[in-house]
Each structure stands twice: as structure tokens, then as C-alpha cells.
């Protein structure tokens, strides 16, 4: 169901003029009844709002799209434990990043946080100074190990509602 909701959000974000529900449903790849159900779920989640006789995507909805949007291959975040020691993990979206942070070695998190790699990636790739600042605050708190992992996950979850 999350895939269908994401598809609805993506199409809503791309559509530049009003269209009827049947045409929208066709663009999404669902029948009109399923499309209305997904729209209502998105309204309930605060990702879409009713606007006049139609719907519009909210800022929260746009933020969720950003989480799942892939970055260009050359902008992916590659996790290392030290210079020249890759972990084999690469994040090509914020969602990827979040999932990798859950399982990568804490040595990698410590390596990147204290080099400011995470905050620089957030600013450069996502233009997200607020999240970059949250990550910088973790560095200032001098968190280590699992506390650091939980701090990073919490910062991302708070921003995007995971």
C-alpha cells in the first residue's frame, strides 16, 4: 500500500493543472476507487489536503517525496570506517541512508559524523540545513557507539515522521 501512496504523491507533485479523478487514477495505475482510498489515507496522514473540489500536496507530502527520491549516482553517500576502508554500503536516498544507519558499523557513523560528512551531504545534496544542524548538534554532544546511531535515527525520524 505504501508504494501506491507514494505513486499518488509523485503524480500529484508532477501534475500542473486540474484533472478529473479518472484521468488521475489512470496516471497512477489504479482504479478510481483505489485512488480515492489512497487519497483519503494521504489526507489522514497530513500528506495531502483538500483544496476546493480537489486535492493538493502538503509540505509534509513534499518532504516525504524527498525522502524516497533517488539522488544521482555521483551524489550517493558511501559509508567508510576509515579513509580507504569502504563498508560496501551506499545511500542513494534519505530512506536508504536511514536504513543503512540502522545496520552499518558504529565505527563508520563515528568516522563520518566527526568529519562532518553527514551534515555536508545533507546540505549539498538535499539543501537541508535544518537536518544538517541536527547532525552537527550530535557531534557537539560527543555521542559515540549505539547512542550516536540512535541520535542520527531520531534526528531523521523527527524530521520526516518515520
Task: Give the role of each language-model region.
Residues 108-141:
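Amphipathic alpha-helical packing elements
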Residues 43-53:
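A short, conserved structural fragment
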Amino acid at each position: 500500500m505504501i508504494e501506491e501512496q507514494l505513486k499518488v504523491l509523485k503524480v500529484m507533485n508532477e501534475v500542473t493543472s486540474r484533472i478529473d479523478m479518472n484521468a488521475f487514477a489512470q496516471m497512477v495505475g489504479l482504479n478510481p476507487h483505489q485512488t480515492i482510498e489512497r487519497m483519503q489515507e494521504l489526507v489522514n496522514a497530513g500528506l495531502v489536503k483538500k483544496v476546493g473540489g480537489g486535492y493538493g500536496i502538503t509540505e509534509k507530502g513534499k518532504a516525504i517525496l524527498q525522502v524516497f527520491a533517488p539522488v544521482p549516482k555521483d551524489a550517493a553517500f558511501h559509508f567508510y570506517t576509515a579513509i580507504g576502508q569502504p563498508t560496501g554500503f551506499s545511500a542513494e536516498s534519505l530512506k536508504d541512508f536511514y536504513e543503512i544507519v540502522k545496520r552499518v558499523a558504529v565505527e563508520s557513523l563515528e568516522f563520518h559524523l566527526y568529519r562532518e560528512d553527514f551534515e555536508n551531504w545533507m546540505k549539498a545534496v538535499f539543501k537541508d540545513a535544518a537536518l544538517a544542524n541536527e547532525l552537527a548538534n550530535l557531534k557537539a554532544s560527543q555521542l559515540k557507539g549505539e547512542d550516536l546511531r540512535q541520535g542520527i535515527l531520531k534526528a531523521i525520524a523527527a524530521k520526516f515522521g518515520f
